[in-house]
A protein has these predicted regions:
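Short pre-catalytic strand/loop immediately N-terminal to key active-site residues, enriched for Gly-Thr
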Residues: 251-258, 305-309
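Beta-strand->loop->alpha-helix junctions that form or flank phosphate-binding loops
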Residues: 38-41, 76-83, 121-124, 219-237, ...
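A conserved, hydrophobic alpha-helical segment in the catalytic core
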Residues: 160-174, 213, 256-291
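Phosphate-binding loop of NTP-binding sites
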Residues: 7-13, 31, 44-47, 56, ...
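ATP-dependent carboxylate-amine ligase
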Residues: 1-22, 31-37, 48, 52, ...
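Short polybasic amphipathic segments
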Residues: 239-246
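Short, polar loop motifs at secondary-structure junctions
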Residues: 20-23, 41-43, 56-60, 80, ...
Length: 423
């Protein structure tokens, strides 16, 4: 919503907003944009407005929501409002269970490197691009398109409102158990999205993702741009290269590491290539791309210990992160600290898949506040303090600590770093 506020401000609207709390860097960013913010939800803080944009975190019973409904004031969801802003733009939307933020920022970085004044709205914070949103003056607009619901009054996925011209589908898996009952529920929302891609639009996807293949077999009416063996765009993970129309392009020497990032890079290069950017120019732009905060981000390094922070909160993402670290830091011992943070993880929906994903760690410690792992592994606790104490006792025996959570990770890595420095 903060990014949307910036885009609406840049569009010429007067903007103010309320939220439960505001934190840096977004609070500082909104202040710099001269956007008034109010902590908490109070009718007294609500100005007379032409339109009220309601975020999907709010529901019936909220004082401001009830005031809007009781007085028949005009309102829309955030995605619907953004969709109106995007009506005249050429939208590149990045969707899928994993890799949306990284891939979207890669596309932004490529286009900006070509001098294109794009618009964008991406979750997370890039290490190289200022801010997570910009209106821009060019026709092109890049957006991270997630499948979460739009608002309490519109349970369609957000991405339905964005009307993409180019859609990237990185992968599809079951997640967001608080919103979706099963994989079929998620597939249904993606099918609705596929149905609104124009006939002259493009869908970029990976042939090796069965769930995406199953989705597209239900029907597609746009140009399909598969990445896979014997296709126009191919990926060779073992040799770290992209092959397009018989030409090979090396991805060696990139700042980012891990097979999942090679796939993200390939998706970004493919999406920009079909929008007019030469592959060699995209590779040149991405070679020094430093990625996104909280994606395999090194928070501490000395001669004996490395601490890495990652946003992984799904078995597949956990395995991606572990595999990437093992490949980058060969023959190093790795201890993992995994917090069950997402609604799906907290409820234990993934079952034993979380253990399988973490099997290649030398040791794993689990922060499990609902105790769904109790009795199933030795190093799990509902106590954050107990987990941190355990890590402090063990960290000298390992080369790398890999922290994986979608919650505030600073509260986890900061005390460990202080412990190391204080020894």
């Amino acid at each position: 919503m903060g990014g949307l506020a910036q885009i609406l401000k840049e569009s010429g609207h007067e903007i103010s907003g309320s939220d439960k709390q505001f934190y840096p860097p977004m609070s500082d960013h909104l202040k710099a944009l001269d956007i008034n913010t109010y902590e908490g939800y109070s009718i007294q803080d609500m100005p007379d407005a032409d339109l009220y944009v309601i975020g999907n975190a709010l529901s019936r019973g909220n004082e401001c929501v009830e005031h809007i409904l009781d007085n028949k004031l005009p309102y829309k969801s955030g995605p619907e409002m953004l969709g109106e802003v995007l009506e005249d733009r050429e939208v590149i939307a990045v969707s899928g269970t994993h890799g949306k933020t990284s891939t979207a920022y890669m596309i932004c970085h490529i286009l900006i490197s070509q001098g294109i004044d794009i618009g964008f709205l991406v979750g997370g914070i890039s290490n190289m691009i200022d801010g997570s949103a910009r209106l821009g003056n060019d026709k092109l607009f890049v957006i991270e398109a997630d499948e979460y619901d739009s608002a309490f009054f519109d349970k369609r996925s957000k991405f339905i409102h964005y009307s993409p011209n180019t859609l990237v589908i990185n992968n599809i898996e079951f997640d967001h158990a608080d919103i979706f009952n099963d994989l079929d529920d998620i597939q249904r929302q993606f099918h609705h999205l596929v149905k609104i891609i124009p006939g002259n639009g493009n869908i970029v996807y990976f042939k090796d993702d069965k769930n995406t293949e199953d989705l597209l077999e239900k029907g597609s009416w746009s140009s399909l741009v598969p990445i896979g063996a014997d296709e126009t765009y191919q990926i060779d993970l073992s040799n770290k290269q992209i092959i397009s129309s018989g030409d090979s392009y090396s991805l060696e020497g990139f700042v980012l590491f891990g097979s999942h990032n090679i796939k993200n890079i390939t998706a970004a290069i493919t999406a920009t290539h079909i929008n007019g950017i030469e592959i060699k120019d995209s590779i040149s732009a991405l070679k020094d791309f430093e990625g996104v905060k909280r994606r395999l981000e090194i928070k501490y390094k000395d001669s004996s210990t490395i601490i890495i922070d990652d946003f992984a909160h799904h078995p597949t993402a956990i395995k991606y992160a572990i595999d990437a670290v093992k490949d980058k830091f060969k023959n190093r011992s790795i201890m993992g600290f995994i917090e069950l943070g997402s609604n799906t993880m907290i409820e234990g929906v993934h079952g034993d898949e979380v253990f399988k994903a973490a099997a290649d760690l030398d040791e794993s410690i689990w922060l499990d506040k609902k105790e769904v792992l109790k009795g199933r592994c030795k190093n799990s606790s509902d106590s954050e303090t107990q987990c941190l104490d355990l890590i402090k006792d063990k960290i000298d025996h390992y080369d790398i600590l890999l922290i994986m959570t979608n919650k505030n990770s600073k509260r986890l890595w900061e005390p460990i770093i202080e412990h190391i420095k204080g020894k």
